[in-house]
Structure formats: C-alpha cells, structure tokens
C-alpha cells in the first residue's frame, strides 16, 4: 500500500463537498492509487469494491506515517483537501514537520475569502477553482475544473409519468427541490412559487428533499403553515433526509427539478437532475448559468424572485412535450460537458502540473 494521492473528508455531516468527493472517488481510483481519510462515503465503498488494489482506507495517523517519505519513484505524495482544517493540517505537515508532500485545494466560493483562509490557500501547491468566478477570488488558481455528475449513478427512467406513479403521491408528474432545507437554499421561494402554480396544474405534485436542522425549525414550521393554509398539504410534500441510494430514484421520479438558492458556490443538483432526464429551472447563481441553457435544457430566473420562478415553472408545466425534450437535451449536455469523468481528468491534470513544478 503506497497511495499517490490522499483525499480528505474530515467533516461528519454530508455536505455538497462530501457529495463531490463521493462521486469522484470511484472514477479517480480507476487510474490512481488513493488513500482516503475521514467520514466514510458510499463512493468510497464503491471505489474499494471496484478497485481494491487502488483504494485504501486510512486513519489520519496512517496517512501521516506514509507521508513522511516520498513515493518509491521519488515523487512527492499529494494531499487533496477541500476544507480549512484540512489545509491547516497539511500545511503543518509540509512546512513545520518538513514532510515531502504537495498540497492541492479545491475552491468553490464566489466571494473574497477572509484573511486566514486566503493565507491558507496561498500556501497550496495547486488550487482548483470550480468556476471562473471562483478563480477570480483566488490569485494562485492552477486550473478551472467544473464539477461533474455520474452518468452511471444518475440515469433517466423509461418514462417520467410511470416513474412518478411508483411514488404513490398524487398527480401524474412530479416537480422537485433537492438539498438542505434552509433560507440560503431558497426552500421558501420554491414553496411560495408552488402555492401560486399548483392549483392550476392538478396533474403535478411537488416534493422537497433534505434535512432541516434544529436552527431551521421555525423556518420549516412557517412553510408548513403556508402549505396547510393553501390547502396543498398533499401536493407539496417534504420527504426528509434521503439515504444516498434513494436520491437517484427521486431524480428519476420528477419531471422538473428546481434549484432556486439565494446564493450557491457551485450547485451540483442541476447536473444530477439533467443526467436523470429532468428539465431544470434554476436561479442565476452558482454555476447554473454555465450549466442550464434557457429554452433548451430548462430556464433561468433571477434569484429571490418568486413570481419569475412561478412563471418559468408554469411555462414548462403547460407543455409536457417540452419537458421531455429538455430532459433529453439535459442528459446530452451533461454527457458532453459535465461528466464526472471529465472532472476527474481535469483534477488529474492539476496533479501532474503540481508534481512537475
């Protein structure tokens, strides 16, 4: 066992960063010997099952012990980190303990970092930005690499209407919002838009996935009250936190996927939905303006604009053939431009650049 790259996931809660790592590991392990430390992920288990010779679970102490020496070929080992505490650890190993390692960081934030994260990022050997905007806030960006979606994990069903029927929920087609339940994700914007639209479209039912933490109890309760008052409790349904293996099924179940956050660094859910054959309506934040092609794979609306979201959704609901066409076009776009394999290749390019420096 001598992994060339050590990938860290040192956060207990499953986040968007966790989702990215989860999707990448089985692909990266097909070409690289990887050591993985931190909270376990389904993607790590899959990588271990598919590539047992290339994928290794490590404790932090095992990873540190391995990193005291260079690889047998004389090259430095790479640590790929994505969070501030992970940068702090690896900078200490390299600069204080003088370990022969190279550090790569992925930055998605679309704002100027505070002074301490800026200093941490400045100490990296390589920086991957997930969008050109993210790169504009990180002077030492090595390469822009867009996130990708797994075309194997996220696949379209044969028929969206048939897929919806298996849910047991009312109506003939579904519209969904995926991710955490909180104000920044725009859950309330989605609920308000659905209250405007659903009474005119009895064939549609809305679902909302994701966890509401204790801090969002009042926020969730206010939405529940709005939904009950509107008489739509059976047609705007909170599914709660889904198991990882259930998420692809629910993308298959819905015909339209909405992503309406007030702010998003990148936002992977539209890619997963498009790979699953959904038409997508998204707000103009994150990487959505790069991903969604208005009129072809979905529609884009201003952030925090309930009326604009309602109009865009109503436009799609009025023409199911357009939904189907957009779903096919979305799958084709992810295949051509935003596959997880393309992301993995971009990351591998950065690893090579860092090792050659």
Predicted regions and their residues:
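Short alpha-helical donor nucleotide-sugar binding micro-motif in glycosyltransferases
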Residues: 241-242, 249-254
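Aromatic "clamp/platform" in nucleotide-sugar-dependent glycosyltransferases that forms part
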Residues: 262
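Donor nucleotide-sugar binding/catalytic pocket of nucleotide-sugar-dependent glycosyltransferases
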Residues: 121-160, 169-170
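Conserved donor-binding/catalytic core segment of Leloir-type glycosyltransferases
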Residues: 166-185, 191-195, 207
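Nucleotide-activated donor-binding/catalytic signature segment of Leloir-type glycosyltransferases, i.e.
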Residues: 220-241
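Short hydrophobic beta-strand element within catalytic cores of glycosyltransferases
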Residues: 279-283
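A short, well-ordered alpha-helix in the C-terminal region of glycosyltransferases
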Residues: 315, 322-337, 343-346
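Conserved acidic donor-binding segment of nucleotide-sugar-dependent glycosyltransferases
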Residues: 294-295, 299-307, 315-321
């Amino acid at each position: 066992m001598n992994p060339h790259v050590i990938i860290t996931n040192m956060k207990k809660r499953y986040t968007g960063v966790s989702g990215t790592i989860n999707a990448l590991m089985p692909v990266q392990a097909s070409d690289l010997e990887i050591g993985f430390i931190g909270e376990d992920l389904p993607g790590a288990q899959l990588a271990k099952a598919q590539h047992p010779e290339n994928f290794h679970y490590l404790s932090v102490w095992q990873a540190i012990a391995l990193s005291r020496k260079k690889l047998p070929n004389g090259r430095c080992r790479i640590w790929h980190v994505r969070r501030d505490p992970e940068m702090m650890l690896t900078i200490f190993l390299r600069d204080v303990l003088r370990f022969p390692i190279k550090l790569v960081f992925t930055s998605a934030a679309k704002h100027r970092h505070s002074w301490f994260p800026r200093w941490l990022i400045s100490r990296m050997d390589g920086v991957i930005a997930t969008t050109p905007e993210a790169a504009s806030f990180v002077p030492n960006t090595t390469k822009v690499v867009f996130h990708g979606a797994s075309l194997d994990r996220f696949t379209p069903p044969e028929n969206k209407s048939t897929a919806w029927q298996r849910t047991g929920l009312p109506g003939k087609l579904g519209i969904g919002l995926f991710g955490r339940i909180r104000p920044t994700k725009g859950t309330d914007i989605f609920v308000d838009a659905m209250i405007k639209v659903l009474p005119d479209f009895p064939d549609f039912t809305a679902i909302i996935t994701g966890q509401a933490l204790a801090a969002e109890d009042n926020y969730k309760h206010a939405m529940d009250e709005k939904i009950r008052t509107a008489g739509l409790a059976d047609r705007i349904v909170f599914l709660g936190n889904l198991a990882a293996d259930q998420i692809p099924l629910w993308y298959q179940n819905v015909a339209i996927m909405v992503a309406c956050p007030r702010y998003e660094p990148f936002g992977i859910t539209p890619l997963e939905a498009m790979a699953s054959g959904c038409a997508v309506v998204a707000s103009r934040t994150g990487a959505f303006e790069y991903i969604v092609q208005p009129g072809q794979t979905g529609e884009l609306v201003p952030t925090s604009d309930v009326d604009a979201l309602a109009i865009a959704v109503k436009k799609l609901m009025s023409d199911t053939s357009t939904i189907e066409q957009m779903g096919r076009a979305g799958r084709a776009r992810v295949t051509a431009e935003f596959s997880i394999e393309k992301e993995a290749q971009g990351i591998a390019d950065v690893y090579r650049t860092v090792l050659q420096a």
